[in-house]
């Protein structure tokens, strides 16, 4: 079940590349020829190895088809000139990574676009790819944050991840929850309303969540 999978997640390890698709032509070519490509300048040694690629379709280009539905296992990565990617011709000597994909697999659902999406590329892990329902959730950084979100989503459909790389937390209605300094802090319109230790939440998530929720009107 999900509990056994959750215990195995390495939250610092992000080996799923989320690649933004720039056109319907690119989507068709990448799917038909089982590959994805990205400028060498966008990846560093720290991003390697990449084990899977997930295709992100923006709302502006794909409308009702927006979100993430397809992902695939990376078989190999080649460094090539852009002009050598003949499936989508463009004359350029710029260097790209060509990621060859075993086959594109459907998640069986869409990971929905919410407040913010993916401009070029981003990274997540396989667990989040398989269990998240909205794109911002793919950037959750810890088990306790994932567990808190699952509890929160049972109470409200309004919850969203705070769009800030330096903050782990969620916004919903007039409230905000922030994970910092070893604590989970609840803020309302007039400042901090309550807090609990992250360690206490890990030991007793339901009880600690209920303790914070008593302050909220959802």
What are the language-model segments listed below?
Residues 9-167, 171-173, 180-182, 189-218:
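Structured alpha/beta reader/binder surfaces that contact nucleic acids or chromatin modification marks
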């Amino acid at each position: 079940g999900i509990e056994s999978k959750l215990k195995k997640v390495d939250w610092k390890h992000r080996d799923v590349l989320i690649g933004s698709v720039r056109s319907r032509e690119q989507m068709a070519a990448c799917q038909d020829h089982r590959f994805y490509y990205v400028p060498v300048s966008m990846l560093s040694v720290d991003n390697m190895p990449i084990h899977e690629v997930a295709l992100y379709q923006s709302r502006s280009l794909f409308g009702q088809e927006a979100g993430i539905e397809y992902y695939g296992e990376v078989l190999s990565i080649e460094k090539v000139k852009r002009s050598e990617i003949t499936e989508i011709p463009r004359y350029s000597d710029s260097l790209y990574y060509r990621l060859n994909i075993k086959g594109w697999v459907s998640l069986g659902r869409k990971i929905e676009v919410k407040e913010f999406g993916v401009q070029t590329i981003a990274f997540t892990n396989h667990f989040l790819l398989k269990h998240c329902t909205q794109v911002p959730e793919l950037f959750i950084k810890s088990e306790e944050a994932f567990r808190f979100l699952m509890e929160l989503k049972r109470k409200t459909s309004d919850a969203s991840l705070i769009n800030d790389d330096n903050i782990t937390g969620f916004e919903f209605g007039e409230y905000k929850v922030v994970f910092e300094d070893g604590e989970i802090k609840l803020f309302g319109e007039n400042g901090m309303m309550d807090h609990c230790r992250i360690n206490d939440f890990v030991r007793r998530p339901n009880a600690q969540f209920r303790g914070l929720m008593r302050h909220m009107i959802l």
